[in-house]
Amino acid sequence: MKKLALLVSGSGTNMQAIMDACASGEINGRIAVVISSNHEAYALVRAEGAKIPNYVCCKKDYPSAEARDREILRLLKMYDVDYVIL
């Protein structure tokens, strides 16, 4: 089973479709982590409800784009993801 990371910024309707496909076996994987660029993204609520680890990496919270990118990479490595889905 592959570990997926989802990068989200909005309501999470695509994320919900992926969650459903994983649950039904249509996708042989599980969502290991959700990373949002938006503190207000409803996708974070969906992730919380499904007990999926989730983080916000908003560019205003970092001194540079490179610092934010390093944090995203750190999270991807921490969860040992196989695929990143945008």
What feature does the model see in each segment?
Residues M1-L86:
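One-carbon transfer enzymes
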